[in-house]
């Protein structure tokens, strides 16, 4: 039996600037299970993530570029519709990296069976998925959390940033949160209870602003944006401060990425530690994260918000809106 799969493909590479909807195409093709790919899955939820932007250029990166005209990839949760594999049954909920399409056929090694949980199943793409794991590993392994310190978080209204803020608050940290809209500022202050939140778009001079809101300086900066914000934060880091580099979204979309940090002397003088990390390197470190995060969620100590677009046809728009900061919390496409 064959079925029609609708999917998102990239029409051309985008070396600089923001993607446009005309850079993408919704295509269809017939698929059917066979001896090699013997499981048919219908996706229910598709994760939309900033790292995908790096795969839309031909530059060498930590993941290969998307292939022009072929299915894009991304994390997804789906349900098994047909199976000739003994380990998977019709109705099983599964996780895969075969998102950006409504249906697909695959082999068993491309799927992970999901356990039922007492919360929305898409939590496996949010706080219980890459989002939460990134925040957890970034803080505990690379940020080297110490009690009673002060953390600055950029892109704090997004999925990773908002999780970082809440973990830090749970551990008694002072949390300074930067975001790009007044609505997100309100959410961070009144629902997530950060110590201070501000809309960076309304700040003329970040260096002066940091001195005003945190004169004692930052012990840790969790960087999701890079660029000028990172450079400004370096000035206000404490001696022996730590900077964890999780993303560089401000530079991925820039038409002129700039010449890099101009205040590296402060890294030397302040004896700062700057550490970049990729969550893909930590797939074998999920057990303590899943245990801790599940408890926080059950106790109401981690809250998550979702921005949801309906239908595979709206996946390109959801991605563009993510890069423009129009999401609060996790960006998802519901199929």
Task: State what each model feature region is.
Residues 3, 280-335:
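C-terminal hydrophobic helical "lid"/dimerization subdomain
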Residues 228-302, 335:
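Glycine-rich phosphate-binding loop and adjacent beta-alpha segment
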Residues 131-134, 159-160, 229:
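Hydrophobic/small residue at the entry helix of a nucleotide-binding pocket
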Residues 169-232, 280, 284:
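Adenosine-nucleotide cofactor-binding segment
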Residues 72-79, 90-155:
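NAD(P)H dinucleotide-binding glycine-rich loop of Rossmann-like/cofactor-binding domains
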Residues 30-48, 56-100:
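Glycine-rich beta-strand-centered segment in the early N-terminal region that forms part
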